[in-house]
UniProtKB/Swiss-Prot annotation:
Protein name, as recorded: Histidine--tRNA ligase
Gene Ontology CC: cytoplasm
Keywords attached to this entry: Aminoacyl-tRNA synthetase, ATP-binding, Cytoplasm, Ligase, Nucleotide-binding, Protein biosynthesis
Record's subunit section: Homodimer.
Principal cellular location given in the protein's record: cytoplasm
Organism: Yersinia pseudotuberculosis serotype O:1b (strain IP 31758)
The keyword ATP-binding is assigned to this record: yes
Top-rank EC class of the record's enzyme: ligase
Enzyme Commission designation: 6.1.1.21
GO molecular function: ATP binding; histidine-tRNA ligase activity
Amino acid sequence: MAKNIQAIRGMNDYLPADTAIWQRIESILKQVLSGYGYSEIRMPIVEQTPLFKRAIGEVTDVVEKEMYTFDDRNGESLTLRPEGTAGCVRAGIEHGLLYNQEQRLWYIGPMFRYERPQKGRYRQFHQLGAEVFGLPGPDIDAELILLTARWWRALGIFEHVKLELNSIGSLAARADYREALVAFLEQHVEVLDEDCKRRMYSNPLRVLDSKNPDVQQLLDDAPKLSDYLDEESKQHFAGLCELLDKASIPYTVNERLVRGLDYYNRTVFEWVTHSLGAQGTVCAGGRYDGLVEQLGGRATPAVGFAMGLERLVLLVQAVNADFQVPATVDAYVISSGEGSQSAAMLLAESLRDALPTLKIMTNYGGGNVKKQFTRADKCGARVALMLGESEVAAQQVVVKDLRNGEQETLAQADVAARLALMLG
């Protein structure tokens, strides 16, 4: 017998029981985005490889070790997108959306990184990202954070996430700090693990977010990035903190927060949780004022964030037992006897016409009435609509409330109004 073909490791199927909660969460996220005036943009899953090398940085872990890259039949190097910002910027430049314009954009979809699969971290994962172009001030940074805070409240998880902030300054300020940090690390190389030694010269700021406790203790005595910030970056960060204080958004300044992608400058932030174990970051982002020009456009201030949906779903399930997922089916049509099957089909169609938001399922494939009621219960229906030979002949329907067992017989013409009342 042929061996079953299974999903690729780290790339998961999401079954109907899973997608119901995903859809509910996504609808809340999209509603909030709409309320802030953001518009959806959809980009390809596959991009030219140089896009990510130029945007993310050739010596980052993402580019060096995690990208799914291949040559097409024309010999062109292509990559499954590992993140969404680079593609969004590319699309904005290509279609003339960015120059001398303000844009508030969002996107949602699968991303791909070759990582070791674990809870909340997969090789195919889903992100929702938001990007703002054309606004240089700290006020838009604050609005993005307020937007995310509104999400957490709507999802019932605000008390389980904490905001961490930092400013990594300008490119010139980071260059000066990088030199001082490398000099410090060279004096303590015996404390560094192999990963930190590898990063020490290629991407030394990433040593700051090492999970090694010995390295973290060493960094207590390292030069502080805040001491190297340019004056404009200091003022920008102070302005952001002031706005968050006025909006009563609690936060912690984490001077070791640097983010793993090279395009960031000034503001960086993360929403973290301790409710999911080691995988603590739920949402992260920051400012990337140089990226548009770096990818061939005109200099354009920009800021944004991305959120892993797998991790968000896990968090909602872990901490909000009251989170409600709408039933898949409101009403289930049960039929028995000659002529009842076609009558059931037509009844369901007429109810869909009368109540466009009604979720109604018709029993097909036969089965006695008891089995049909079992199917109605299994799909979570609130109401059963029963048609037998006598009901078909009399143009009537038996309407049964599956929660309390009460039932009544109505004329078919009255069923829509009764359902609207029962289902609210």
